[in-house]
């Protein structure tokens, strides 16, 4: 084997031992396994002397692999034979299942652990020799004729002799006799010869700075073509940077695909840019201005490096601006209604402003007699909200005011009788209505409710006053 490779060793896993070596051995494919594992009868040899020399592959880890035929103690094949000429292999521990990791974890075999004892069974002396015995379970029982024995030595390495195996020596003589030529030997890598990677030691020893490269020590042969394809790049400066070993050691143009330096004269496209005139306002309520964002690079540069949309023009930035200088309400409504009496003392004004379905009434009144409907002792109160004509409301207020002024001097001179009491009650009712309406003049929605309440009170008090006798003063 490859003796010159440090760390190289023959150490297959349990799955590899079962699936490859033992399975191919039982199926008759000896050419796949004989170069790695030799066949012996493990019960015919003493571990302390013979086993290391019989292994096909010698190991410094003090472990060896063998194919061994299965021998049974009785014809029923229920118990395997474990005794040797000077001792016996004693099973210990529990059997471990070996599963095929690439076959959904199916059990393909088991591994038994045994320790070699010198002497007669069951009394014997334990030795540092341990054996892992691999049995296959994925084949029919009549084909299970061999096991793989992994023998390990747990003692000192000085106690083991490493003489060449007689079988290996005989195999080498057989090859010479058949072919007439000795078996080729594996050689360690020598300077000047190619290794597995297709490189020689001379190529690795040769200094990098002795190779002839016209662009510099760190420029690849295809870098010159790449630089010519770039736009807005200072070719001389880039070559100088890549040629400097101290600044960029070991880098090439293939490692860096982004231009490092942009010429100052390429920024001339920005000289005419004015931030004040970049956006323009229109007289529309909602204005949308679309501007193409200027770029110091051309379309070819963007297509070459970004690869945007298979060569389509680069993205444009959309800028939206809304003009709010002439922002006004959509439906402005403003009106004023003035109510004035003949004497000039009674006046009322209503101002209403509406915007988009929202109204805010503002009512201002000049005197105490306004927003009233005519009421009398025999007539019921009329709803002011049903009157849509302002002239009718104003006329009723004036008539009511004049009637109240005419009744005041009559009430002073009239005698105190039942009729005068009714007049006073009527006057009081009118003043109460007037006073209530004045307090609630800013709440038109409650006018009808107040009129109904006051009318009910008057209608109740009038019959009561007629029944109660009034004493003369």
UniProtKB/Swiss-Prot annotation:
One GO cellular component, as annotated: endoplasmic reticulum membrane
Residues annotated as domain NAC: 4-154
Induction notes from the record: Stabilized by cytokinins.
An individual GO BP term: leaf morphogenesis
Region Disordered, residue ranges: 326-380
Superkingdom assignment: Eukaryota
Family annotation (InterPro entries): NAC-dom (IPR003441), NAC_dom_sf (IPR036093)
DNA-binding region of this protein: 108-160
Alphabetical UniProt keywords: Activator, DNA-binding, Membrane, Nucleus, Stress response, Transcription, Transcription regulation, Transmembrane, Transmembrane helix
PROSITE patterns: NAC
Compartment list: Membrane; Nucleus
Domain remarks in the Swiss-Prot or TrEMBL record: The NAC domain includes a DNA binding domain and a dimerization domain.
Protein name, entry field: NAC domain-containing protein 68
Upper lineage: Eukaryota, Viridiplantae, Streptophyta, Embryophyta, Tracheophyta
């Amino acid at each position: 084997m490859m003796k010159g490779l440090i760390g190289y060793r023959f150490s297959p896993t349990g799955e590899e031992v079962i699936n490859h070596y033992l399975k191919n051995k039982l199926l008759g494919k000896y050419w796949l396994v004989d170069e790695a594992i030799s066949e012996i009868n493990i019960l015919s040899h003493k571990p302390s002397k013979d086993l290391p020399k019989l292994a096909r592959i010698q190991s410094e880890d003090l472990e060896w692999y063998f194919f061994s035929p299965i021998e049974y103690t009785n014809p029923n094949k229920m118990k395997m034979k474990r005794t040797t000429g000077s001792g016996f292999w004693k099973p210990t521990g529990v059997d471990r299942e070996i599963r095929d990791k690439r076959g959904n974890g199916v059990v393909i075999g088991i591994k038994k652990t045994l320790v070699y004892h010198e002497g007669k069974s069951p009394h014997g002396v334990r030795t540092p020799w341990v054996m892992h015995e691999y049995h296959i379970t994925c084949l029919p029982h009549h084909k299970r004729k061999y096991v793989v024995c992994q023998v390990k030595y747990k003692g000192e390495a000085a106690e083991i002799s490493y003489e060449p195996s007689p079988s290996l020596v005989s195999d080498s003589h057989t090859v010479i006799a058949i072919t007439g030529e000795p078996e080729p030997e594996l050689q360690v890598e020598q300077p000047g010869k190619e290794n597995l990677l297709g490189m020689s030691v001379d190529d690795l020893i040769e200094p990098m700075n002795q190779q002839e490269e016209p662009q510099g020590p760190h420029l690849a042969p295809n870098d010159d073509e790449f630089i010519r394809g770039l736009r807005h790049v200072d070719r001389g400066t880039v070559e100088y940077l890549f040629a400097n070993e101290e600044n960029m050691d070991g880098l090439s143009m293939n490692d860096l695909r982004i231009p490092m330096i942009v010429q100052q004269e390429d920024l001339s496209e920005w000289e005419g840019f004015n931030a004040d005139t970049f956006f323009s306002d229109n007289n529309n309520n909602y204005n949308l201005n679309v501007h193409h964002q200027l770029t110091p690079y051309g379309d070819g540069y963007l297509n070459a490096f970004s690869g945007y949309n298979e060569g389509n023009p680069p993205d444009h930035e959309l800028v939206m601006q809304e003009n709010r200088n002439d922002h006004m309400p959509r439906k402005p409504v403003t009106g004023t209604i003035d109510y004035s009496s003949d004497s000039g003392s009674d006046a009322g004004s209503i101002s209403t402003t509406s915007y988009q379905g929202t109204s805010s009434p503002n009512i201002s009144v000049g005197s105490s007699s306004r927003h009233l409907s005519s009421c009398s002792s025999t007539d019921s109160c009329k709803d002011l909200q049903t009157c849509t004509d302002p002239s009718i409301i104003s006329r009723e207020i004036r008539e009511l005011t004049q009637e109240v002024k005419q009744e005041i001097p009559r009430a002073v001179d009239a005698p105190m009788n039942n009729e005068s009491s009714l007049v006073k009650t009527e006057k009081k009712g009118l003043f109460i209505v007037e006073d209530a309406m004045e307090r609630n003049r800013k709440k038109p929605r409650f006018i009808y409710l107040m009129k109904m309440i006051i009318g009910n009170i008057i209608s109740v008090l009038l019959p009561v006053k007629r029944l109660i006798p009034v004493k003369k003063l």
